[in-house]
Amino acid sequence: MAKKVQAYVKLQVAAGMANPSPPVGPALGQQGVNIMEFCKAFNAKTDSVEKGLPIPVVITVYSDRSFTFVTKTPPAAVLLKKAAGIKSGSGKPNKDKVGKVTSAQVREIAETKAADMTGSNVEAMTRSIEGTARSMGLVVED
């Protein structure tokens, strides 16, 4: 018989840097999950990813206090900031432009995020990432 799901916990945790401090500890502690077990498993799974990159994770907690988790790709905004070499987006994206990204970089980000995005093809996903870039105050060059 399948285990009964108690809760879903969604977090963004820095790759390879999960530890029992907030936000991980309190979120999982409320569900009665072994926090260190999650931290070790998460850090092992995100070993191949650049350390410190925020990774969205969905943790499924079962009624017997066991858990499974699924990691996703980093948010598009984080990947765009990294590609443009900036710390943060523009406060006024329509007036102040803070950086530039090329179409090739945007396409590469779209291909990276393809597994997590809803879209029929890479072109549609590329347009979506371009929209995110524009809303951050980045200029997309051909």
UniProtKB/Swiss-Prot annotation:
Keywords: Methylation, Ribonucleoprotein, Ribosomal protein, RNA-binding, rRNA-binding. It holds the Pfam family Ribosomal_L11_N. The keyword Metal-binding does not apply. InterPro entries: Ribosomal_uL11, Ribosomal_uL11_bac-typ, Ribosomal_uL11_C, Ribosomal_uL11_C_sf, Ribosomal_uL11_CS, Ribosomal_uL11_N, Ribosomal_uL11_N_sf. The keyword RNA-binding applies. Coiled coil: none annotated. One of its GO terms (molecular function) is structural constituent of ribosome. CDD domains: Ribosomal_L11. One or more lysine residues are methylated. It comes from the Bacteria. Part of the ribosomal stalk of the 50S ribosomal subunit. Interacts with L10 and the large rRNA to form the base of the stalk. L10 forms an elongated spine to which L12 dimers bind in a sequential fashion forming a multimeric L10(L12)X complex. Belongs to the universal ribosomal protein uL11 family. NCBIfam families: L11_bact. This is Large ribosomal subunit protein uL11. The lineage of its organism: Bacteria, Pseudomonadati, Pseudomonadota, Gammaproteobacteria, Enterobacterales. The gene is rplK.
